[in-house]
Amino acid sequence: MVICNMEDASRYEGLHPLFPTLFAYMRSHDLLHEPTGRITIDGDRLFINNSAPECLAADKQIIEVHRRYIDVHFLLEGSETIGWKPTGECTALSQPYDAEKECALYAEPAQTYVTLHPGQIAIV
């Protein structure tokens, strides 16, 4: 997991070949005022799920695991607490991996929590 401000995101562009394109898009677009939904940048290789999720308290969250995509959270307003736990330590499977939804769900507490504020990014 990487946590940073948008101003520092360029330090992490070398972690994935599509990060420079993603971060450039995020810097140059007002995502808060874009319609919610999928924003396609490079087909299925790179896209943004622009959403306004209901943020749950840490004790009500479940663990979401991805296999194909990297999840990059970019907070636009308010605050959001997200949890993390090593995938190999997740045991309470509540939804098996679904390739179409690209996730599996585990109903158990995370090991670590971080609260994001506007302009902050979490790469999980």
Sequence positions of predicted segments:
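Short, conserved beta-strand element in jelly-roll/cupin
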Residues: R68-E80, P86-G88, P96-Y106, L116
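Residue-level signal for pocket-adjacent positions within structured domains
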Residues: M1, A58, A92, E100
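A short, N-terminal "cap"/entry segment at the start of jelly-roll beta-barrel domains
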Residues: V2-N50, A57-V65
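Short, mixed-charge amphipathic alpha-helical segments
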Residues: P109-Y113
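Structural motif
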Residues: L46-F47, H73, I121
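Conserved metal-binding segment of the jelly-roll/cupin
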Residues: V114-V124
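Conserved short histidine dyad/triad with adjacent acidic residue
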Residues: I48-H66, L76-T91
